[in-house]
Amino acid sequence: MEKFGMNFGGGPSKKDLLETIETQKKQLLQYQARLKDVVRAYKSLLKEKEALEASIKVLSVSHEADVGLSGVQPPGLTFPDSVDDRCSTHSEDSTGTATSLDTAASLTSVKGEFGVEDDRAARGPLPPKSEEASGSESGVSSSSGDGPSAGSEMDKRVHQLKTQLATLTSSLATVTQEKSRMEASYLADKKKMKQDLEDANKKAEEERGRLEGDLKVLQEQIAETKARLITQQHDRAQEQSDHALMLRELQKLLQEERTQRQDLELRLEETREALAGRAYAADQVEGFELQTKQLTREVEELKGELQTIRDEKNRPDPRLQELQQEAARLKSHFQAQLQQEMRKTALAEDQLRQQSQVEEQRVAALESQISEVSELLGTYEKAKQKDQLAIQKLKERLLQLDLENKTLALAASSRSSLDIHGDESSLDINVLKDKMEKLKKLLQVAARKSQVTLDVEKLCDPEIMANSEAADGEKATALYYQQELKQLKEEFERYKMRAQVVLKSKNTKDGSLGKELEAAQEQLAELKDKYISLRLSCEELESQHQQEAEDWKQELARLQQLHRQELERSQLDFRDRTLKLEEELHKQRDRALAVLAEKDLELEQLRSVALSSGLPGRRSPVGGVGGGGLGDPADTASSDSLTQALQLAAANEPTFFLYAEQLARKEVEITSLRKQKHRLEVEAHQLQERLLEEGERHREEVGALQSHIEKNMRDQSREGANLEYLKNIIYRFLTLPDSLGRQQTLTAILTILHFSPEEKQVLMRLPSGGSWWPSGKR
């Protein structure tokens, strides 16, 4: 109530006190249950502690007994005692580390057997006499005189070990029992908590359904109250038309001028920024389009040249075609994905915009309903003040009637005293005169209060009485006065009946007014509760829709991030593949250059061989002439083949180098084209990102402008109701004497004015506003 400014003074109500008492009772029951659990756990821990102390005590006693026996033992029984010590050591270790009785017994027996066998193996083969002496108990008893005492000590030792084992098993059983009980209690508590959780969920579902039904009923009641309030507003508008119209027109003009000026400034700045950004983007887009067109022309020319080269060579590179096809396929795939993501984002933005519009309409409807309920509360406050004035008037009337009843009671008491003493003093004329004077005064008072015209002067005129006394003194007898008293009694009875009727009517009227006041108070409390519940539901819905909008935005950002990551991944894959292909082309070119170098070397060798062989060939005719003119046919055939090979090599040499140069030029052009293609793709992606950013910013600006326009329309539609509600709240704020009421009324003003944080800070800095501002809002 205090949060929404509905409690205009006073302490906590009876309902709040009962709720606090119930919560304290629940807390006491919880604390009692926790205390019982703590006591139970403490008792179980005490049992475990006692069991562990008993086991520790037994172990310490066994250790002391072992020490005592080892100190008193004779030298002839060294080996059995060592065996027993080992067995006891093994049993103590096993019982100290085991988790149950069976494992402890098994470990003890196994370790004892292993100890005896190890001792026997370590002792080795004994001589026959020693084996016979130590083989049986009779031999030991006949050979040594201390045999019976050692046997009794061994029996005591065995009995002591058995008792220790029994105590250890009992302590272990108690510990396991406590652990199992704790585990069972833990499982029971877990089951109970699950059941409580299910019950709480069921209760929450039922409460949610009930609240939805209550919300529907409240909406219907709000519609009814809205219709009633409209009629009341029409009635009140006729009464306060002049002042309200003047104030409304002035405030409307001022607000419209301010809003128009602010809107024009904001729109001017936004349009300037938008025009500058669009002009810059348009210039960039035109420049990029020109660059892309130029590059596409160059690419087409280069493609034509490549096609001519391929046609000349008639050996197209299949890997380059596959690369281009794959690049085109990836480009189309990415464009399709981009268009699909853009459609998804546009659809999500449309859904968010529609949902935000619906939520704003609902919030506006709820705010109008809240303003109407606040106006209804103002009317109820006025009716309450009127009822209080009527109650005050009725209280004054009741006090007046109480005074009349008191006077009537005094008159009745005086009349009874007159009746009692009438017989005794009826014969005295002076006494009767005094009584008549008193009765006359009482009659005058009663006549004034009951507004009955009685001619008291004529009845009790002293001149008439004096004349009657002088004329006929004998007629002043008891009968005359008794008749007058009878008349007075009748008049008194009539007045008494009238007073009773008045009292009855007053009581019935007070009862009806009290019932009406109680009904009005109950209705006011119900309306306050409904207002609070509606406000809370409105806030919950608003927070829920804000959360949904944030989730949508996060999902959109996530999808965009995934798309960008996939795009970058595909670009990286494409770059890796292009780099690999470029490396292969470079390797192929290196191999071609190496082959060309080898061919050059071979040609040089052939030329050198041809030159060396050509010199004797030229000299052969001289020798032939000197030698008789005969030559070798094999030498002539070899020289002819060499000259033909040289001629072929010389003829094919320019074409081979031209082919190598063309291959190198083609590789250089391909690498440059790939670089240009990569650069163009990067620029295209950057342009797409910029266009997307520009589109998002434009959509945000359009949404902000639409929300601002809708807010202005809502403000204009709700201006009359808000001004009326604000007038009532400010009137209440100015008429309240206490600071607590002022703070609560100020919180009610906040529900309609919606101060910004900067305005709140300015108000808090002021010395006068800081005292009015509530501590919870700072």
UniProtKB/Swiss-Prot annotation:
Residues 94-109, 133-152 have a biased composition (Low complexity). PROSITE patterns: GRIP. It is found in: Cytoplasm; Golgi apparatus membrane. Keywords: Coiled coil, Cytoplasm, Golgi apparatus, Membrane. Gene3D superfamilies: GRIP domain (1.10.220.60). Residues 13-61, 152-702 form a coiled coil. InterPro entries: Golgi-autophagy_related, GRIP_dom. Its main location: cytoplasm. Residues 83-93 have a biased composition (Basic and acidic residues). It comes from the Eukaryota. It is a peripheral membrane protein. The keyword Coiled coil applies. Residues 716-766 form the GRIP domain. Residues 70-157, 186-208, 617-638 are annotated as: Disordered. The keyword RNA-binding does not apply. GO terms for cellular component: Golgi membrane. Probably involved in maintaining Golgi structure. Extended rod-like protein with coiled-coil domains. This is GRIP and coiled-coil domain-containing protein 1.
